Amino acid sequence: MFETAEGVNYISGGSGMASLMDWSTATFGRLIAALETLQKNYDFVLFDMGAGIVDWSLDLLTSLDEIIVISTAEPTSIMDAYSMMKFIHLKDNSKKFYLLCNRAFTIEEGQETTKRLKVVMERFLEKEVFVLGSLPEDVVVRQAVRQQSLFTTLYPDAPISKTMKKIVQQFLTHQVGIEEVHSTTQSNKFLSKLKGIFSKGRE
């Protein structure tokens, strides 16, 4: 585990989870024990699934308590986001989704992107989703990547940094708009669902 000065620790997962179903029961048990420890020691445990969702990652996503869906304004990205939410919703219609538009060139573009996804989910799946907002296209992100540091740390006054902090604060205080959108209590559903997926995959 790598620690950062900002209090956000991370584990580089690589592609190890792709062979999850091939693990022995003992190895999987150690994973569950480690995740239980993380749940006790951290306020939030985030899984960055990235682009290019495959079957095993979709199964993992269905076990999570809450899902933040990040899309750009590009039609292919919007379609991928909708397809993923539809797949998960049909497996578990109690899942909560939060929408975030990334790399928006204007405020209007970001709003239109999240609105399209929200409307389509409500119209075709009768599923309510929550809009977190949008992050603007900003050159400081690439500069921060080159320096291997957080853009919120290197460029705290950049538009994207201010927007990111606002969105995170809204989520941490359990408010999106004027509605409370997620529980302050810790859920144990994730681990029980993950165990179920592992057991099913080995049948």
Where are these regions (language model features)?
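P-loop/Walker-type NTP enzyme "switch/lid" segment
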Residues: M1-K40, V145-Q147
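Inter-motif core of Ras-like GTPase G domains
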Residues: A33-N41, V54-T76
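G-domain G4 guanine-recognition motif of GTPases
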Residues: T72-A73, F97-Q111, S134-V141, P156
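Conserved C-terminal guanine-recognition region of P-loop GTPase G domains, centered on the G4
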Residues: I78-F97
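Conserved phosphate-handling catalytic cores of large alpha/beta enzymes
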Residues: H89, F105, V119
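Short helix-capping segments at alpha-helix termini
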Residues: D92-N93, M121-E128
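Beta-strand-loop-alpha "switch" segments that mediate conformational coupling across diverse proteins
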Residues: L125-T152, M164-K166
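NTP-binding/hydrolysis catalytic cores, primarily Walker-type P-loop NTPases
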Residues: L150-E203
